Amino acid sequence: GARYFRLGKQADFYSSDRPIEMLQEIRASCPHLEMLQIDNVNPNSVVKEGGEEITKAIVEYCTPGNIAAFGVESFDPVVVKANLLNTTPVMAMKAIRIINKYGAQRGENGLPKFLPGINIIFGLLQENKESHRRNMEAFDQIMREGLLLRRINIRQVAVLPHTFLEEHGGTKYLSKNKKYYWKWRDEIRQKVDNPMLERILPKGTIIQDVWTE
């Protein structure tokens, strides 16, 4: 039977119906799982009451290499407010610390058990050079605190019809700042992504059961 499972396509695993019990039941029903991992997580849910208990359950019942995909989108408070984003930079940092507190320990396959991943979006309302500086400032703080990020996804915003973004600016900031995106993206890759990868997988690390695609 199937032994590899990813509980994906949900907006926030932590707000699922009885997530701890669900993981316990999956493990009890299929004790010989090879992989059990989750998908998206709202950082606010990690910080709120009960969030740490769910985090500990994910570390206990899921397999190592697990990622909490955080839709932070921007660490610039001005951009967060202008776009009605769910997570403030302060809440995002708290959630990153909590996930690291319980999930940074290395598992039997050689990977940390449970780490945050950060999604950043370029082209949001009120974005400017200060927005990139704020993003880099947050990433620098993460590095200085010795925290781990499994990955950073950087995308350009998709302006969909009849959305808040389309009605309040559309592609204005995307068009205005597009000339900076390669530079901004490359700075994150060189100053954060690559050093973080060396921190997560130092030279000599052996990773078990690797599947390539």
Predicted features and spans:
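Conserved SAM/AdoMet-binding glycine-rich loop
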Residues: 1-117, 122-127
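Auxiliary Fe-S-binding modules of radical SAM enzymes
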Residues: 31-33, 103-104, 110-112, 136, ...
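Extended C-terminal regions of large enzymes
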Residues: 132-133
